[in-house]
Design a protein with these regions (language model features):
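Membrane-proximal intracellular helices of multi-pass ion channels
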Residues: 1-248
Length: 248
């Protein structure tokens, strides 16, 4: 009993996440600093900034990715963006699973209520569904963007579609083009696809899962959390649209 309590005190999920993040940043900086990852010499601070930005999906860079990095370097950044996005979506799940072997039924009910999950939800199933959701959405987005980019005659439409799909779904804002997505400002199809991916990533997995459970009659009603997320999303979208249209 004492050993169990001692182990619980020694294992700190938050420290694990922090050191894990730092570890990925160090690996990312090391890889992106390799000569064949750069088109031009890029300083340590610039590489560090870009890697942290990718991991945290903020979308800020110290320069044009197309001018700074080779395809290998861009793949590294894309991997970090995806890792950062999935990490945020599974952060809570990771914290739960870190103690899942010793979690009590009482604690499961508390977590179920806190995160608006069904009382009998399975943690491993929950995480696997997040991954499946990510794969499905990004696959659909990639196919649609690839079709549109091919119509526009862009070079390497598949690679461009993959990168911008992951970036949009992660709400990272990264682009392999020097002018970002400005070249598509008059393309309704591309903008709608990007917007869909951004929304799908921003609302997360719980909302569509909750709606699916309601439509399949596995739950009696949509949870309060989902209602709040959808309400705020709609309100922000409408308000932003009105302000934008009014100022244009």
């Amino acid at each position: 009993m004492k050993r169990t309590k001692l182990k619980d005190k020694e294992v700190n999920p938050f420290k694990t996440i922090l050191f894990g993040f730092l570890g990925y940043v160090i690996i990312g900086v090391a890889l992106i600093s390799l000569p064949f990852a750069q088109k031009i010499p890029v300083g340590f601070v610039d590489n560090l900034f870009n890697v942290v930005s990718a991991m945290s999906t903020t979308g800020l860079t110290t320069g044009s990715l197309s001018d700074m990095y080779t395809p290998f370097g861009k793949i590294i950044l894309l991997g970090l963006i995806q890792l950062g996005a999935i990490g945020y979506m599974t952060l809570t799940s990771f914290l739960i699973l870190s103690t899942s072997k010793k979690i009590s039924t009482h604690r499961v009910k508390i977590l179920s209520a806190e995160f608006s999950m069904p009382e009998n939800f399975d943690l491993k199933h929950f995480i696997s569904n997040i991954i499946i959701y990510t794969i499905i959405v990004e696959f659909i987005g990639t196919v649609l963007l690839c079709i549109e980019f091919s119509k526009l005659g862009l070079q390497k439409p598949l690679w461009s579609a993959i990168f911008h799909c992951v970036s949009a779904f992660s709400t990272a804002g990264f682009s392999i083009y020097a002018d970002g997505l400005c070249r598509f400002q008059n393309d309704v199809s591309v903008n709608l696809i990007i917007a869909f991916l951004c929304y799908a990533g921003a609302i997360g997995f719980i909302v569509p899962m909750d709606i699916y459970r309601r439509l399949t009659h596995k739950s009696k009603e949509i949870t309060f959390t989902t209602k709040i997320i959808l309400f705020i999303t709609v309100m922000i979208t409408l308000t932003g649209s009105v302000i934008y249209i009014g100022s244009s």
